[in-house]
Amino acid sequence: MPRRRVAAKREILPDPKFGSKKLAKFINHVMESGKKSVAERIVYGALDIVSNKAKKEPIETFELALENIQPLVEVKSRRVGGATYQVPVEVRPSRQMALSMRWLVEYSRKRGEKSMAARLAAEMLEAAEGRGAAVKKREDVHRMAEANKAFSHYRF
C-alpha cells in the first residue's frame, strides 16, 4: 500500500465531435507517442466506416462493442505456502472499461486490413456482434476464472 495519499482522478474532457467521455478515453488509448491528432483521425475514421457499414449510430455501436468485451471476472496470482494459485476475482467497473478499451486496440492492431481506421472499425463491428478476437479474449479470461473457481476462497 502506498504511504502517501492516493492521487485524485483527473476529470477527462469529452471528445469534441460526439461529446462522449468514453470516446475521449478511447482516443487516449489509441494514441501513441503523444500524437493525439493522429489518434483522433484514426478513431473518427473508424466511426465513419462503422456508420456506413452498420447503418446505426456509430457511438452506439462503439459502446455496444465495449460492453461485449468487458470482463466480469479475472484471475490474479496468489502465493500460498510455496504454491501459486490463480484466484478468480471480480473486476471493478473502471478496470472493466480500461481492459475492454485496451483489448479492442490491441486486437485491432493485429488485424490485416490496410489502415488502422479500417482495422479498428472491423474489430468494433465484430465485437458489437459478439464475435472477434477481443470478445474471444474476454471469454478466455472468463474460462480461466471458471476453471479456478475452487481457489476463490483465497480472496484478496
Swiss-Prot record:
Gene3D superfamilies: Ribosomal protein S7 domain (1.10.455.10). GO terms for molecular function: rRNA binding; structural constituent of ribosome; tRNA binding. It comes from the Bacteria. It holds the Pfam family Ribosomal_S7. GO terms for cellular component: small ribosomal subunit. Keywords: Ribonucleoprotein, Ribosomal protein, RNA-binding, rRNA-binding, tRNA-binding. The keyword Transferase does not apply. The keyword Ribosomal protein applies. One of its GO terms (biological process) is translation. SUPFAM superfamilies: Ribosomal protein S7. Part of the 30S ribosomal subunit. Contacts proteins S9 and S11. One of the primary rRNA binding proteins, it binds directly to 16S rRNA where it nucleates assembly of the head domain of the 30S subunit. Is located at the subunit interface close to the decoding center, probably blocks exit of the E-site tRNA. Belongs to the universal ribosomal protein uS7 family. NCBIfam families: rpsG_bact. This is Small ribosomal subunit protein uS7. It comes from Hahella chejuensis (strain KCTC 2396). The gene is rpsG.
